[in-house]
Amino acid sequence: MMTRRVLIGSAAGLLLADELVAAQAGASGPRVVFEHDVPDLTMKGWSASGVEVSYAPGQSSPPHRHPGITIAYVLEGEIRSKVGDEPEKTYTVGEMFIETPNQLHAVSRNASDTKPAKLLAVMLSEKGKPRTAQEK
């Protein structure tokens, strides 16, 4: 039951964010901007967190992994990202990407050398455990 509540709550938050972007862009009604299969997980003892990640112009994060599921939504600027076997891609405001458990996030950086960038990471992870592990 908790698993459903967490997933429904996370999905509702993402839909509200989609509504906000649509309203700001002058669009009407909800639209699907992202869909991705997720692994079959038992999520007892897990929690959902919203983490804002801000990048100064040209700034990047070191390669890392998340033991849980991370859904990233670009709030400002452009984010250059490479997750798992997917090709490196630039995401713009309103676009999303997902990191499934323990996938290598090899590239995470601001695509601009002159403008800031920001994303919201909705992270589903085990309570009391680190959300991120830096790649050695």
Predicted regions and their residues:
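N-terminal secretory signal peptides and thylakoid transit peptides that target proteins
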Residues: 1-18
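Histidine-centered metal-chelating micro-motifs
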Residues: 60-62, 80, 97, 101-110
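Short, conserved beta-strand element in jelly-roll/cupin
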Residues: 69-80
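A short glycine-rich, His/Asp/Glu-containing loop-to-beta-strand
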Residues: 28-62, 126
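Ligand-binding loop in jelly-roll beta-barrel domains
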Residues: 87-88, 103-129
